[in-house]
Curated annotation (Swiss-Prot):
Cofactors that this protein relies on: heme
Class of this enzyme: oxidoreductase
Major subcellular location class: membrane
Pathway(s) where this gene product acts: Secondary metabolite biosynthesis
PANTHER family: CYTOCHROME P450 MONOOXYGENASE APDE-RELATED, P450, PUTATIVE (EUROFUNG)-RELATED
Gene Ontology MF: a single term: oxidoreductase activity, acting on paired donors, with incorporation or reduction of molecular oxygen, reduced flavin or flavoprotein as one donor, and incorporation of one atom of oxygen
Annotated binding of heme, by residue: 456
Lineage: Eukaryota, Fungi, Dikarya, Ascomycota, Pezizomycotina
Function recorded in the entry: Cytochrome P450 monooxygenase; part of the gene cluster that mediates the biosynthesis of fumosorinone, a 2-pyridone alkaloid that acts as an inhibitor of protein tyrosine phosphatase 1B which is implicated asa negative regulator of insulin receptor signaling and a potential drug target for the treatment of type II diabetes and other associated metabolic syndromes. The polyketide-amino acid backbone of fumosorinone is first assembled by the PKS-NRPS hybrid fumoS.
Protein name: Cytochrome P450 monooxygenase fumoA
One Pfam family, short name: p450
């Protein structure tokens, strides 16, 4: 035995011992949960059978492979299908308890009833899941930091801002000039991304990127896509970040920061100069009204400001454009739905397209809701338990008993499965049918923008912009045809987008 040990490299022994200690520290708390007392009335949740019962590495490896192969949505559906007798279950995820659910009442508890008991910082800041892309921001912070981040942006998502379609109109006018003539096949997804980049860059920075005219200026979109893909993967695997090579993600971050830094630095310099002139009693010009300027007045520090801007600009630059692309993906495959939309739009003639007009278009809103339902942008809602808490459902073999959740546990509500649950939506849950929304009331079973205090502040703005663009297209074109050869496959960023694009053709007659 002594001779054998003597032949081993001592540093490797130390490394092996350290790794074993780390893995055991992850595994032992998970196994000891069954021996700790639980709250009165609570029952343990069902658990998924796993090959790696000790360290729980089979789930993150399987999940990571699904993300790389662009079949993450299918992976989630298969995972839930493997537990047909319950809507809530858990897995050992790298030695940690990860609770999956499609129960609306659990979503309500996490987002509203027990809001203070759940957070995102343990996932996105500790360990550094989103670093060096961003640290503190409205979607990475809890408590006072979150409240401050929300205060930075809240004025720009008030009713007086989101109800205006005047901001959207010139960009939509320009967008329509880039659509090919009748019957020509084109991919509308990247064009929508450039349209939205131009509009959001003016809204946030006060100056449009004008990438519709100059496509080369849209390169930052593809870097942002890689950043979003990486943040999604890191949010899902934040307990085992060490297991992956992140070089590609860091390179994408450098490109995005390189795009944002000139805007931020020039804004801070302009702000300092303006404040100095005011101090000296010198005249100043009209103050800027863009979001970055407003944020800089409250947070005049470059790195902290960049973190806040990254969290707002990068994820949101993908959301609206991809959502509209998904709406058109379905409409191109359902000509009756396009016909009904066009009838609703043409019924108002040439009336100005206002927020109130869009809100009253029932079929248009049914189309948007049905698209949110079938391809939700937020596929999962993930929170970390900040304290011990009892959820109203999830325990027992059928998931109907209360469930004891411990500090550090992860609760993940799978919206892409919940929104197709036949118990809630009927036997046609997988079918595209905008008519189902006629008279349907909302609730915790359908929250495309989240709920509770952390509900997306841009909800009405996204709906207004998306509805406006769909209305303009329906007013202009009599028909839309699908020209995709491939079935839909989701490529994950923060949310899913079509791996093969959205290839369509429009006809005016």
């Amino acid at each position: 035995m002594v001779a054998t040990l003597a032949n081993l490299n001592f540093p490797y022994l130390i490394l092996s011992a350290c790794l074993s200690a780390i893995l055991l520290s992850r595994f032992l708390p998970f196994t000891r949960r069954d021996r700790r007392p639980t709250a009165k009335g609570c029952l343990p949740e069902p658990r998924v059978f796993q090959w790696d019962v000790f360290f729980g590495l089979d789930i993150p490896i399987s999940q990571g492979r699904a993300l790389q192969q662009n079949r993450y949505l299918e992976w989630l559906r298969d995972l839930h299908a493997s537990m047909p007798r319950t809507k809530t279950f858990s897995v050992n995820f790298g030695g940690y308890r990860w609770i999956y659910s499609i129960e609306p009442e659990i979503l309500k508890a996490v987002y509203a009833t027990n809001f203070q008991d759940f957070g995102v910082e343990p996932i996105r800041q500790h360990p550094p899941g989103f670093k060096p892309f961003a640290e503190k921001g409205v979607s990475t912070s809890d408590g006072e930091d979150w409240a401050f981040s929300r205060s930075l942006i809240k004025p720009f998502f008030e009713r007086s801002v989101y109800v205006s379609t005047d901001r959207v109109k010139p960009f939509a006018d320009k967008f329509l000039t880039f659509i090919p003539e009748d019957g020509e096949t084109f991919d509308i997804q990247p064009l929508l991304q450039r349209w939205f980049l131009d509009m959001t860059s003016e809204f946030i920075f006060g100056k449009s990127q004008d990438s519709m005219t100059h496509p080369e200026r849209a390169e930052v979109i593809w870097a942002m896509a890689d950043v979003l893909r990486g943040t999604r993967l890191r949010a899902q695997t934040y307990k085992i970040l060490w297991a992956f090579n992140w070089d590609w993600w860091f390179k994408a971050i450098e490109k995005v920061h390189g795009f944002l830094n000139p805007y931020i630095r020039s804004t801070l310099a302009e702000l300092a100069e303006r404040q100095q002139r005011v101090k000296e009693g010198l005249p100043v010009g009209e103050e800027r009204t863009d979001l970055l300027w407003s944020m800089a007045t409250m947070l005049p520090e470059e790195e902290a400001l960049r973190s806040q801007v990254c969290i707002i600009f990068v994820p949101n630059n993908d959301t609206t454009s991809i959502f509209i692309a998904h709406c058109l993906y379905f409409l191109a495959r359902h000509p009756d739905a396009w016909r009904k939309l066009r009838e609703e739009v043409t019924a108002v003639g040439d009336a100005p397209i206002t927020f109130e007009l869009l809100r009253n278009m029932k079929y248009l809103n049914g189309i948007m809701n049905e698209t949110h339902r079938l391809i939700p942008n937020n596929v999962t809602q993930i929170r970390s338990a900040l304290s011990d808490v009892v959820l109203p459902l999830g325990g027992g073999p059928d998931g109907k008993a209360p469930l004891d959740v411990r500090k550090g546990d992860i609760v993940s509500v799978t919206k892409t499965v919940m929104y197709r649950d036949p118990d809630r939506w009927g036997a046609d849950a997988d079918e595209y049918r905008p008519e189902r929304w006629d008279g349907m009331r909302g609730g915790w079973h359908f929250l495309p923008y989240g709920g509770g205090p952390r509900r997306c502040p841009a909800q009405m703005m996204v709906q207004n912009e998306s509805g406006y663009m769909l209305c303009r297209l329906a007013r202009r074109y009599a028909r839309i045809e699908a020209r995709d050869k491939e079935p839909y496959r989701a490529r994950m960023r923060i949310g899913p987008s079509s791996l093969h694009g959205v290839k369509i053709a429009f006809y005016k007659e």
